[in-house]
Each structure stands twice: as C-alpha cells, then as structure tokens.
Swiss-Prot record:
Encoding gene, per UniProt annotation: Scrg1
UniProt-recorded name of the protein: Scrapie-responsive protein 1
Disulfide bonds: none
Keyword entries, A-Z: Glycoprotein, Secreted, Signal
Compartments (UniProt record): Secreted
Length: 98
C-alpha cells in the first residue's frame, strides 16, 4: 500500500515538473491594441503588413505568410491562414514577404 502511494506521488511530481512540449500546429490568439484604433495600423508596427489594399483590416503577422490578423475594433484576432480563409482558398491570398 505504501509503495503504491509513493509511486503515485512520484508520478504526479514528475508530471507536474515536466514542461509540456509546444504544439507544432499554430493556433489563434488575440492582441489588444494600445490606442484601441484599427485605422492607423500598421503604422509603428513592423510585424504587421497589409495583405492587400482590397482586403481591408487584414494583415500578415510576422515575417512569414502563415498568420493573418483581422483588426476588430480594439483588438487584433490572429489565426493561421487556413483557419481564417479555409484550405481551399488560402493558397490564393497574395503574400509579399520581402
């Protein structure tokens, strides 16, 4: 009995101390805007690039073209492009990562 209690405690301790491995799959997240205004984006934000002049309030997040952010009132909602647009049309979204 005592041996099983010690094993359970040891197992729980190891489980709690072990850091979880980050998932390789990207997920959605939110970014709050300091000035609560979407109209002056991406001024002052080098990490945001407008996708296209015809696609208002949508920005590439970061250096690549995997994450898309949508400016919604006082926050940015950022998701992988496949989640945002769907896998059937996400490949036609223009990406200029220069």
């Amino acid at each position: 009995m005592m041996k099983s209690v010690v094993l359970v405690i040891l197992g729980l301790t190891l489980l709690l101390e072990t850091q979880a491995m980050p998932s390789s799959r990207l997920s959605c997240y939110r970014k709050l805007l300091k000035d609560r205004n979407c109209h002056n984006l991406p001024e002052g934000r080098a990490d945001l690039k407008l996708i296209d002049a015809n696609v208002q309030h949508h920005f590439w997040d970061g250096k690549g073209c995997e994450m898309i952010c949508y400016c919604n009132f006082s926050e940015l909602l950022c998701c992988p492009k496949d989640v945002f647009f769907g896998p059937k049309i996400s490949f036609v979204i223009p990406c200029n990562n220069h």
